[in-house]
Every structure is written in structure tokens, then in C-alpha cells.
Amino acid sequence: MRPSELTQLKQDGRAISILTAWDGLSAALVEAAGADVVLVGDSLAMVALCHATTLPVTVEQMLHHTQAVGRGFTRPLPQQPLVVCDLPFLSYQCGEDKAVAAAGSLLKHSCAAAVKLEGAEPEVLAVIERLVRMGIPVMGHLGLTPQAVHRLGYRRQAEDPRSQAQMLQQAKQLEQAGCFALVVEHVPSSIARCLSQQLTIPVIGIGAGEDCDGQVRVTADLLGLTPSQPPFSPPLIQGRQLCVEALQGWVKQLHQQAETATTTTSQPEPDC
């Protein structure tokens, strides 16, 4: 899967599926599920590294986890999902050269074929244009942007006409800057539908209704592995509970075997 193929999927009316992965095991599961795109999201800061937000994760850590994702795939390269890697906080907000170095490192030394950036500020648009000129595909991200948690929080975005008009303008700017797709998170379905209709590039929703060109989800949330999930991403199974019960069963069985062994007739020790 190549970035340019996602636009064709939109034109064909086929929903685009994106799931996150953070190591080889999760990558193998997502690949087997048939997802079009694997996102190595900076959400791994919380899912895999137990941070409270996405902010602490570094470029080096993103590279480490993306390399692990690549090793988890089992299919030949042409049949593998497209891998998009998040550029973490302050890896692209501090200048174009730093952004090019970070994105270039991810594409050179891992299976990533594209990067994702949050926001549409003038500085971010300039970075996107520079990356695209350098041959690095870029996915945009508007709405709830976790890297801006201290400014915006986790509340739903674009709820009034003024902010919706601003989002539409920003989305068009991102498309013009060269983004091949756009993620919109935790926004009303009406604005997501409008974006999908007015943009040529695919609009991928998470908590943005069902009228987008595709959907992205954090795999650990869908599997119920995280302690809690966002209201717009309910779990499909209670994976955390199932795993704990299975491991508890093993521990219990081990203890029972030990108790049984102590109550049986002892056998003479063999000569060593």
C-alpha cells in the first residue's frame, strides 16, 4: 500500500482502515486483520511506556518501536500495510531542518513510509511543504490534537460555526501543502462530512462520525487492553479482563500442582 493509493480508495468508495501498532506482536495482529494502514502513533507513550500523555515520547523511541513493528510483519513488502509514524512533540515545531532530520531518520531506518503531524499553524504548514518537497509523504491531523493537551485538553473540537469554518480552511491548507490524507479527531460528524466532501484527499475519522473516508483506532482501546477508553472508541472485547483471567488461571494451576506434589508419597532421591 502506497500513500497515493488511499486517494484511489476514496474515489472507489471503499472505507480506509487504520489501526495502531507499537511492537512486533501488535503489528502481526493488525496485519492479519487486514488493515490498510498501520499507524505507529505517539499514543504508544501511554499504551506501551505508561506515560500520562503523548508528550514525553522521543524520536529515538518512535524509531525503536517502528523498527519493531516492521519486524512483526509476515507478508512480503508489497503486501504489507502502509506504515505511518507520528512525529512526536517538538520534533517538528522547532524548525524545518529538525523536522526533516526526524522524519528522514524514521523513513531511512525503519519500515515507515510516511509521517503524521498535528495542527495547521503557519510553521507546521511550512514544515509539511518542506517534507513533501524532500519526498516524505505527510498525513495531517486536526481536531483533538493530543500534543496540544495543555492548551486544548481532550474536549471535543469545532463545535461552533466559527471554529468549523476555521477547520475547513485549515484542512484545505493542509491539502494544498501536500498532505496525502487527513485525520480528524473528536469533532462533530457534520464538519467531518463537510471535509470529506470538499477535500480530494481522504479524511480519516476517530470520534468524527461515520461519514468519513475511513476510520482510525488505537488497537489497544479496541481490544479493551487499556484501563479506560475514550467515549468515541469503545472496546470490542474486554481483552484486559480476559488476559488477567487467563494468567490467574495459570498461577492457580501452578499453585495447585505444587500443593499436590507435597501431599503425594515422597520418592527416594536418585543418586547424582
Swiss-Prot record:
Catalytic activity: 3-methyl-2-oxobutanoate + (6R)-5,10-methylene-5,6,7,8-tetrahydrofolate + H2O = 2-dehydropantoate + (6S)-5,6,7,8-tetrahydrofolate
Keyword Metal-binding: yes
EC numbers for this chain: 2.1.2.11
Entry keyword set: Cytoplasm, Magnesium, Metal-binding, Pantothenate biosynthesis, Transferase
Annotated binding of 3-methyl-2-oxobutanoate, by residue: 42-43, 86, 116
UniProt record, GO biological process: pantothenate biosynthetic process
Pathway: Cofactor biosynthesis; (R)-pantothenate biosynthesis; (R)-pantoate from 3-methyl-2-oxobutanoate: step 1/2
Gene Ontology, cellular component aspect: cytoplasm
Cofactor needs: Mg(2+)
Function according to Swiss-Prot or TrEMBL: Catalyzes the reversible reaction in which hydroxymethyl group from 5,10-methylenetetrahydrofolate is transferred onto alpha-ketoisovalerate to form ketopantoate.
Quaternary state and interactors: Homodecamer; pentamer of dimers.
Protein name listed in UniProt: 3-methyl-2-oxobutanoate hydroxymethyltransferase
Gene: panB
